[in-house]
């Protein structure tokens, strides 16, 4: 098991449910995608930019471009996970998020997974990339790693 790295700027708690597990009772890898998305959405909400407001009222579309995950140790059913997220990079048209997942609760935290996700800002009509609006960059500034 790897030791905890620095704590990322935002976190949500997620419990591993029966529906998250494979027949061995450990978390199915695809379940992490839902948890990462929940952490991402809640970070945007904490920044004052709920996804639905960004999408509908502010016309900011952020489809996924790249996703990579590394599993360090298996999470098990009913485990409480600390899903941490921070903004690793703000580009001209893209954002890259970093995620770290640890088992919460008693004892030393166990590092369960690490991931990165890159999203690209696109025009709603043409689905072509466009510059990331300044208000998004400003709202996410407190969540930038190392800032």
Regions found by a protein language model. Give the residues of each.
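Flexible, active-site-adjacent loop/turn segments at secondary-structure boundaries
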Residues: 22-26, 42, 60, 75, ...
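Hydrophobic beta-strand-centered segment that forms part of the acyl-chain substrate-binding groove
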Residues: 43-95, 112-113
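HotDog/MaoC-like acyl-thioester-processing domains
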Residues: 2-12, 76-80, 88-147
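Intrinsically disordered, low-complexity regions of eukaryotic proteins
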Residues: 22-24, 72, 84, 102, ...
């Amino acid at each position: 098991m790897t030791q905890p790295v620095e704590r990322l700027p935002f976190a949500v708690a997620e419990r591993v449910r029966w529906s998250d597990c494979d027949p061995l009772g450990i978390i199915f890898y695809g379940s992490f995608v839902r948890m990462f998305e929940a952490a991402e959405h809640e970070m945007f909400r904490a920044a004052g930019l709920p996804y639905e407001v960004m999408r509908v009222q502010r016309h900011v579309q952020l489809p996924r471009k790249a996703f990579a995950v590394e599993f360090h140790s298996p999470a098990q059913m009913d485990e409480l996970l600390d899903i941490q997220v921070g903004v690793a990079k703000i580009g001209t048209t893209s954002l890259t998020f970093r995620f770290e997942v640890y088992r919460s609760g008693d004892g030393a935290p166990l590092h369960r997974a690490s991931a990165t996700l890159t999203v690209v800002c696109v025009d709603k009509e043409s689905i072509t990339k466009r510059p990331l609006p300044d208000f998004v960059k400003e709202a996410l500034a407190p969540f930038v790693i190392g800032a």
